[in-house]
Amino acid sequence: MRHTNRYLRTTVSAAVVGAAVFGFAGIAAAQEAPASVDDIIVTAQKREQSLQDVPIVVTTLSQEVLDGAGVQDIKDLQILTPGMTVTSTQSEASTTVRIRGAGTVGDNPGLESSVGVVIDGVYRSRNSVGFGDLGELSRIEVLKGPQGTLFGKNTSAGVINIITERPSFDPSVSAELTAGNYGAMGGSVSATGPLSDIIAGRIFVAHRERDGFYDVNVGDGPRTLTEDNTQDYWTGRGQLLILPSDEVSIRLIADYTKRDEFCCSAVQTRVGPTQAFIAALAAPNGPGQRPPVAGFGTVPFSRTAYSNRETPQEIEDMGLSAEATIDLPSLNATLTSQTSWRDWSFQQGMDLDYTGADILHRENDGSNGYGVDNLTQEFRLAGATDKFDWLVGLFATKEGVYRDDSYSYGADYNGFASFLLTATLPAAVGGPSPSRLGCFTNPQGFLVTAAAPNTPLCVVGAVAPSAAAPTFAAGKAYEDHYSQRSESVALFTNNTWRVTEAFDLNLGLRYTYDSKRLLGVQDNLGSNGAACGGALANQNPANRAPSAIPGTVNVGTPAAAVGLLCLPWSNPLYDNRRIQEKFSDTDISGTFKGSYRFNDAVMAYASYARGYKGAGYNMDRVQTGVTPDASLFFDAETVDSYELGVKTTLFNRSMLLNLTYFDQKFENFQLNTFLGTAFVVESIPELTSRGVDADMVWFTPVEGLMFQGGVTYTDAKYNDFTAADLSNPARFPALSLLPGARASFAPEWSLTGALAFDRSLGGGLRGGFNLSAKYSTDYNTGSDLLPYKDQEAFTVVNGRITIGSEDERWTIDVWGQNLLQEEYTQVGFAAPLQGTAFTNTTTPQANGTYYNIATDTATYNAYLGAPRTWGVTLKVKY
């Protein structure tokens, strides 16, 4: 059959990698174990190379390794990758990857990724669209440092390169069934084989579901579901491999995923003084949130969340791709075409105050969510001569990003706002009170007496709040719609010159043209904005109605009260506001590397790389004071990276030991931060990340025993900067802890280790185990570095025991993740409207910051890491 040699040529390396990297994590791995580390093949430079010949820091993980460590989605991948953190926040759509301390929170759809995700050659423009059950994997390669030359923009911190299993002409059918705690159930079915002499197919279908990781106190309702962070999704992937000749290969892929889950609640880690107001509004349906105690309060890892509104999320992801390769013997080259179309959409409902009181929420009615659709095309021509490996390429993409956003007032919003406005007033004059909002918005003005110049007269009791005073009507407050269209074209080349038998030089360049256009409509609904309008009018003496009450003075609504009444969702200046912005940009990025092979066992290299992350727009209501920002634009980010590395092969080529020093400087680092009312990208002038990566793989002399480990030391810090260095100096107080400080999500030390064992038990049986762990030193989980968001050092351990037949017909795995029940926080954040971390934003502290922990009144919440899970998996294959 004419396809045989061609097919073997394209699949042998994948099979070897599947068995080689990190060793005997499963039955199949044991039977295909390599003789040495030389057999570990990667495509980090878009051509097959031995891992030890590539002058890049690459962690390569096979399907067996991923199974052995209990990896089901890319979030779990971090247990095998030192120096990498993956977090989710408001939803599974808000997933962010960081490498060597570089990366940003993913809750802003206008913000593109720092770590690129590529699946079967197709670039995913947002981290969130690349996460889920990826089915049958050949391997995953994690490339550290900027990779823009070959992988394009938005890979300034690294790339996760995912390669799935190709169709096979050898027919097989496999199935898997899993059951575990938290009501986990799931299964998958896969089949591959020939459809004709030149066509092979593969299909994979999986469904997984699980109860929630959180218990929910529903407070005032209307929510009835008492659990959250559930799992429920279907996914499918179909492929065709067409080999019309020995020179031509075509691979077609179609995939579809649908998720229908409840996510993501958070728990209180520290409760501020507003808890008393929450409790009063939530009564008699519970405390509304965890009652306060000294310090941080009770341990939040009972996983009890408070949410009176439902948190449903629906994600739909689909795509098509076509990869065609044509061998050109006359040029000793290969032409590759990669075409893709993808459509991803997300909708959710959300309890925005994270309490049992009915204050603020997002409705699950189609008015909250976003979508991304894109079309990409890449052409590459790669070849080789005796002295040169060369590659030239063209990449083009068109992308649309759409966001719908709305807020709704709950029945308790008026009362809570009144509590906040009267919080400092003693009970003798009627405060704090849930029914005094009109004192601050009444058209007659803000009336006080000489005896009580800071107390509105209606709070004292002489005048009742006017019935005509505008307040906040329960129901939807606003609906905003954003549409961003972007186009990007790039020309690139990557070439290696073998100067001598031992010395290579590599030069890569990429020219990128980027353009984006943003259209938006911001619209308040009904009478929303009237309360703010009344407060603003009362500040103007010309607008204040004269008072007929003797002894009163009309002083206008205080600025602090106006700030609370004119938050972005209640500000009339957004009503019927139209947004239209556009930009175009060009950038030249590239890399220059030199490598020297001292002998067969030792290779050293030095490299420089420049990365580029595109500019964009904040798709949110962003204001300074009460004035909406005139532009939502934020600048592009660049990085210059230097590396010195050595790759060694030891002990008769049974051990791999690699060591790399890195020095990276990011300019205009795109920091996405939550300001309490909106997610905003602010460009930080400079972030440096320096440190060392070390990786080891060892096929031990003990039959069936293998060890893999990695260590990353990272010193990631912001440079010193002032308010004048920011695009909006008014944001400096909230970011004043950053200058000179360690970056968030950047542990100084990150260590991983995996021990795998597999061998014959006799009687036609094989058995083995896999134990993997990751240790991280302490780091901060918030973009503003507030101390209540600190995470202490922690260790996560996963394990798996496997028994099965020698011929792989069946295997049974007993597995556990987070076996030590380690309790840790993914992301910490300050609850909206519930106190403030920055009580003084006009006068800095002696240390130059605007933060004083003694005056911090904020309530803090956290999205927690997954608890201990365990289960059993049965696999069969024919």
Question: What residue spans do the PLM features occupy?
Answer:
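Gram-negative outer-membrane beta-barrel transporters
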Residues: 389, 501-505, 654-666, 683-783, ...
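C-terminal beta-signal and adjacent terminal beta-strands/loops
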Residues: 400-401, 407-414, 706, 774-782, ...
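Structural signature of Gram-negative outer-membrane beta-barrels, strongest in the C-terminal barrel
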Residues: 241-245, 381-382, 393-397, 482-664
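Periplasmic-side early beta-strands and strand-to-turn transitions of outer-membrane beta-barrels
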Residues: 161, 168-170, 178, 192-290, ...
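Membrane-embedded beta-barrel scaffold of Gram-negative outer-membrane proteins
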Residues: 210, 321-325, 334-352, 597-620, ...
